[in-house]
Amino acid sequence: MAQKQKCVAMLLAGGKGSRLSALTKNLAKPAVPFGGKYRIIDFTLSNCANSGIETVGILTQYQPLELHNYIGIGNAWDLDRVSGGVTVLPPYAESSGVKWYTGTASAIYQNLNYLSQYEPEYVLILSGDHIYKMDYSKMLDYHIEKESDVSISVIEVPWDEASRFGIMNTNEEMEIVEFEEKPQFPRSNLASMGIYIFNWSILKEYLEMDARNPESSNDFGKDVLPLLLDEGKKLMAYPFEGYWKDVGTVKSLWEANMDLLRDETSLNLNDRNWRIYSVNPNEPPQYIAEKAKVEESLINEGCVIEGDVKHSVLFQGVTVEEGSMVIDSVVMPGAKIGKNVVIERAIVGSEMVIEDGTIIRPEKNVDDVVLIAEGK
């Protein structure tokens, strides 16, 4: 019998991330590189570790191999525990065949046995594909104080973007009175961050109810949360005011990387009180040639810079040869940039080779971002 836990986290990491195009052709979205030396999933796992959440189930599905290898037993995040720790939970086969996760609620439902062994009071449900730093223990305290059945973390988004999110309409006490999934005409700009705390008994009851409904799409936002509201359960919105970015598109991923280069940013990766942990490869120090120029950039281990790099993020093992310029760009691990190349407002994928004399920049709209990548 597993040791009883007050709160167990379930991290949804099976997303395909189709809007990231070639970056996720052979890679799960949470495993996409970010910020010079991280993967997207590092932020959620580090938040768990820093918040004192010691038991984390990671639900994987799409292209899971590299993600599984990266997570390992969770030691990079101090989550390799005798009791609890990290457990990877892919779909599994029953006598009737393999049961794929058909939605966010389906994924948790198929792992109720995993949760039951810990007899938790609360279950924290997370997404593995957002960039943010958050103390989940404060949200749990809020949930308990408000005597809520479900608490949902929300953040104010620009009104012109509200129709892209699940929107919470609340009363003055922040109790949720209506949930609208991507409304055409939103009445609030409080967007769901995809972070939920459920009382365990409520979660179990309503997931079992949802699984019995043949018309359900087995999704929290579309099915489970509206049902809870219809039945009068208490749902509270937990306001979050820090940095949060949904990096589901090429442009938003680029923007989040560029945010790291700003003088004033709430996403401080050097915060000693809230470290973001990662699995770092062993690479030699970066080499910057005498004639090279580097300005306002993150240059990581193993890079060889002989050209000019300005306001860019370069991952480990990147080469920029003589005469080349990299401006306002993200260059992922192992990419080789030849001589006299110009790269501007672009993301260059892992292990890409950019031939001598190539020019890469937006052709039509100067606000666009170019993606140069291919599946492995």
From Swiss-Prot:
Kindly state which reaction or reactions the protein catalyses.
alpha-D-glucose 1-phosphate + ATP + H(+) = ADP-alpha-D-glucose + diphosphate
Does the record's keyword annotation contain Chaperone?
A: no
Instruction: Give the quaternary structure.
Output: Homotetramer.
Query: Which Pfam families does the entry link to?
Result: Hexapep_GlmU, NTP_transferase
Q: Its encoding gene is what?
A: glgC
Q: HAMAP family recorded for this chain?
A: GlgC (MF_00624)
Q: Which PANTHER family match?
A: GLUCOSE-1-PHOSPHATE ADENYLYLTRANSFERASE, GLUCOSE-1-PHOSPHATE ADENYLYLTRANSFERASE-RELATED
The pathway to which it is assigned is: Glycan biosynthesis; glycogen biosynthesis
This one is known as Glucose-1-phosphate adenylyltransferase
The entry sums up its family as follows: Belongs to the bacterial/plant glucose-1-phosphate adenylyltransferase family.
GO MF annotations in UniProt: ATP binding; glucose-1-phosphate adenylyltransferase activity
Q: Which residues form the signal peptide?
A: none
Question: Which InterPro entries would you find in this protein's record?
Answer: ADP-Glc_PPase, ADP_Glu_pyroP_CS, GlgC_bac, GlmU/GlgC-like_hexapep, NTP_transferase_dom, Nucleotide-diphossugar_trans, Trimer_LpxA-like_sf
Q: Which organism is it from?
A: Bacillus cereus (strain ATCC 14579 / DSM 31 / CCUG 7414 / JCM 2152 / NBRC 15305 / NCIMB 9373 / NCTC 2599 / NRRL B-3711)
